Amino acid sequence: MSSLPVAAILPELLSALQQAPQVLLNAPTGAGKSTWLPLQILADGNIDGRIILLEPRRLAARNVAQRLAELLGEKPGETIGYRMRAESCVGPNTRLEVVTEGILTRTLQHDPELSGVGLVILDEFHERSLQADLALVLLLDVQQGLRDDLKLLIMSATLDNDRLQRLLPEAPVVVSEGRAFPVERRFAPLASHQRFAEAVAIAAADLLREEQGSMLLFLPGVGEIQRVQEQLSERVASDVLLCPLYGALPLSEQRKAILPAPAGMRKVVLATNIAETSLTIEGIRLVVDSAQERVARFDPRTGLTRLITQRISQASMTQRAGRAGRLEPGICLHLLAKEQAERAAAQSDPEILQSDLSGLLLELLQWGCRDPAELRWLDLPPAINLAAARRLLTALSALEGERLSAHGRKMATLGNDPRLAAMLTAADSADDAATAAKLAAILEEPPRGGSSDLGAAFARQQGNWQQRAQQLLKRLASRGGQPDAARMAALLAPAFADRIARRRGQEGRYQLANGMGAMLDADDALGRHEWLIAPLLLQGSSAPDARILLALPLDIDQLVAQRPELIQRSDTVEWDEAQGTLKAWRRSCIGQLVIKTQPLAKPSEAELHQAMLNGIRDKGLGVLNWTPEAEQLRLRLYCAAQWLPEADWPAVDDASLLASLEAWLLPQMTGVHSLRALKAVDLRQALQNWLPWTLRQKLDSELPTHYTVPTGSRIAIRYHEDNPPALAVRMQEMFGEATTPRIAEGRVPLVLELLSPAQRPLQITRDLSAFWQGAYREVQKEMKGRYPKHVWPDDPANTAPTRRTKKYS
């Protein structure tokens, strides 16, 4: 029996696999779950068929396969094999295949029954990659509908057992306790007055001086690795090798980082979280953890992915610390305070909650699932991200309604990112296929640093690109073609139409067809070109413009000739602010980018009217001719809604009238072809015609334009938005009126502005009866002296009214 910790639970695990379709294994770092346990399951002989072991990363997959083969005294390709993108090492006698995530998904899509497979092992499941979540969902679906004999083992160092057990309540949980060796965990926050790279390098160099052994240094990204490496090179002894390790490094370079240091040497491996997984890096007993990681977050509004740097979870800290105790007792220095570590999230967010889901949706539709909620997820894909994915697949012509189109089915069989799959399947000649395959290979593994010129990269003969291109051509069943740089733009444009860009203002600043901004570095030679297509973009954490990582100069006229289907043409009429006229244009656009504008001699009346309405909305209702009569009608409607709310009065505030121009103004615009004619539109008539007949009758009866006073004179009522309605009338014409007149079904009294014979205000009142009995006496006394020839009776409420201003006129 092995001394590895996982050996202690082997009998329990083997028994669980016999009894249950799904088993959960929680085994800490260094327990031997990846590099020992699969062989024991194979040797047990109770699994009916081959074993597939899923590893999330290519380097880990190859290393695990090599280690397992070594333990059998063999080479990969015999009993143990591996398959990954662009590389396969399996043979007719292979019984255990180590595969990467995309390979497992492709296998399931090609053969949903997994013929000849008895067990699938999902390793490092705590990482919760998008593909691992998808693999789990598909495997559970296979078990439920096609293969009730298929076994599934989910294992990790930091399993979220509670959630997995809710999803799989019948699954046994097997726990392997303890690491191989103890790890002393220390906490020390970085000095605030030092730059990050300098502070990390100082902390790492100090630990190297104090302790023996090689070091694994976790950093958030490639930029930090390069800067810390530069700082460390000045601080470490000559017997210390500095080895970077990150996913974009060629596999040969990654392998150098995990090999033992030469005799008499130590090494520092500067790594991203790639080293959290099942890689065993020889000689490591020191770990320095920056406690940071860089994660990709998809923005469904823009369709771009944003990279952010954030604190890692407590589970990741535990995983990183475990790297120090795989081969001997070790030390882990976390570069933050212990209190900060305790406040960190328990687990990292799964990728499925923050990723572009277009590839996942394409896989689900190929699987035959139109509604993701029908499947058994640990975390249901977010609806907003699925909606963005559906929009992209529609733009790529991959959908017909809710199903895959014929083009979409071809895309799905390739297993590429949907945009690249669309480009590959659109190639209709051998040369186009060769060109598209090389472009896809470059975009899958883009060059790091240096030029952003995609054309320059395309001209290079790089081994990994050529190998991947040949693999893609084999899938396309295409042969004999030659890559043609002249066809690059025509092939890229349909798949990346929203990323066609036009220069704006400053050199290096561009607007994308989707309306977003994008930028090149100030000294980038591509900035000289007016038009680009930028298939590789990255949204920064703070800058509003996306950064162009890889782009190709465009001859826009040539592209229009090659891909006329990308062009949208529209006739528009616009309000010319400078000249106060309407101008008609025919525009040719790609998305929001205008390629060509031509004047139109005679637009239709509908186009003219729409332009006028757009102009009114842009400039406000003040551009119309609001006569006093129109203003009063609008105020009457406003007041009616306040005083008689039980009726369905139309809203007449600015926002509502602007929103409903088509309903009330447009019918009045027949024959209106100019701004001068628009100014002549009768707005009072427009608003009146807008009202249903019953409301018009109610308005005229309950909120009349005029009030008939006792003399028979019709006096205009003034309506206000914030004040009561008012009636200005000579006092003599109100004689005989005992009480204040009311409108709106008697709910609203009129404010009476009682005027002198000279039409000057004498009194303002809302209670005529009280005025006649009270304040009128003072007015009468004063007016008799000033206007002795006029009538000033003692009992005005019962005196006949008069239009005459003098007693005997």
Region locations from a protein language model:
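Structural motif
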Residues: 129, 349-356, 381-384, 413-418, ...
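Extended active-site and interfacial segments that coordinate phosphate-rich ligands
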Residues: 111-126, 290-294, 303, 315, ...
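Acidic, serine/threonine- and proline-rich low-complexity intrinsically disordered segments
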Residues: 399, 432-517, 523, 530-706, ...
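Charge-dense polyanion-binding interfaces
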Residues: 121-122, 250, 254, 426-447, ...
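P-loop NTPase motor module signature
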Residues: 1-423, 538, 722-724
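Short, isolated positions in well-ordered beta-strands
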Residues: 181, 518, 583, 714-716
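C-terminal accessory/binding modules appended to enzymatic or scaffolding proteins
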Residues: 686-748
